Amino acid sequence: MKNYGIQQYFLYIMHKIIINLSGILLNNTKHNAIMNPLTSFTKTIHTKGRKIIMEALKRVSPEKAGIHSQSIIEFIQQAQAEGIELHSLMILRHGKVCEEAWWKPYDSVTPQTMFSFSKSITSTAVGFAVQEGLLSLDEKLVDIFPDETPENPGENLKAADVYSLLTMSCGQENDICYQLKSYDHWIHDFMHADFKYKPGTMFQYNSTGTDMLCAIIKKKTGLNVSEYLKPRLFDKIGMTNISCRLLPGDIEMGGSGFRVKTEDMARLGQFYLNRGIWKGERLLNEEWIDMATSRQISTVNPVFDNHDSNWQHGYGFQFWRCIPEGLYRADGAYGQFAIMDPDKDVVIAITSASFCPDRLLNIVWEKLLVGITDKEELEESGSYEQLKHLNAELAIPGLWNVRNRAHEDEWGQIRYQVSGEDVPCFADLTGGPGTWGNYGRKLSAISFEFQRTECRIHIEDEDFASDLYAGMDGTYHVSYVRGEKFAASACWEEENVLSLAVRALKTVSGTRFRITFTEKEISIRRCPLMPQTGEKFSERDWDHLVLKA
């Protein structure tokens, strides 16, 4: 870390505290964590009447951790040059944070949907259950779920066990989640699906199989995965504000439904690098850590059709092996990664909205890894100052700052009401990958107030009213709708067409709206904000609805 003078150091700490306290007060919400200064300190978290004292991770410069700042700069620049939308980056070396960055409007305190990164959390819960003697790897599904088992189960189903679920080799040719019309009886449907292959012999990606592990944890412990892990892992290593989507039966969707913060991703990775130890306390036995993170099964076969090279190096217990020898990762859709390098004692946590996660991983190998030296410490360089400046400026570009003052005054005085068919409430209209179901409410009316740097969009649902603020200064502005954090940016695309980009910050993306104003009505079209690579918004299919003045 660079040697700060006392005055500069004091100002730095006060700056961080003020920023985070201001965000908490302005957003009228409580956050469990605040951004940390460069040194370690403790913070107190109150959880259901219990007080937890959590020590923050130490902060150092990359050079103080033996990493070249220039390699981090080049990673960020290369990802951006290739159009990969990064949301956060955190690097730990020897348990210390040596790089942390968030692309505004994403931040350090908002948990984000992890998709299949969730599987590594579920796997960890299974490890604790095995350690406590509540479960064994060779325990058969037909014995755990006798009431859900077919009357005459086939030999492959009878052989399916916990190990085969952990290694994505239960024997099913396809994940039933793509075939189900309803999840009401999903455990029954899983057990009655075709188990075509002998368990343990054929890798096939199966998120419902991971959800079955959650059902097993609940059946064995009476607790959901997050409840079970809270005193055993989360509280111990400082993971806070963890949530998970529920399936019917009040069972957590551990295959894809967890939401965590970037630092919590890094903490989980460090826990695995520590081989189950945290602050000198053994939490999970190292035999499990070794099994979970080593290659248990090949991922190259005729059934698992994935030609991306980063998914062809084997699979452990819900962890992927990586192209560079010795590395493994927790891996979620659209580029939610915690990459662990045991030899270098490094964790790289990334969140993003990318349809090219394979390319994102390759940029990690090509740019980041080469800058991690075997030295404990490097001399400070001007690159660290450049990196700090780059981190401070990182942001998802908002819509181009184009105003239409004459029409803004005219149309900003009108309340547009829904007429005819029902329209989903605004939060449901926005959606985005990783949204947990719908609120099920209807939109009633909407109005616009164009201000100096933003547009206040007053949203009236049938049971709720709130304001969404969209930046009209080329940036995203953050506000709350139904208690959820949204970011929005707007500009005039044509004389009477307002373009509005809205992101639900708990998810990886959001929705692009085109709002066409006429004398007595507005016409709203929408499409996903995250198109396929190379696809233009003009080529998308847009949903359409009309509101009248």
Language-model features: where?
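Active-site helix/loop module of the DD-peptidase/beta-lactamase fold
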Residues: 113, 132-170, 192, 221-256, ...
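Active-site Gly/Thr loop motif
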Residues: 290-348
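A short, well-structured edge-of-sheet supersecondary motif
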Residues: 71-107, 345-348
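Active-site SXXK
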Residues: 95, 112-138, 165, 213-217, ...
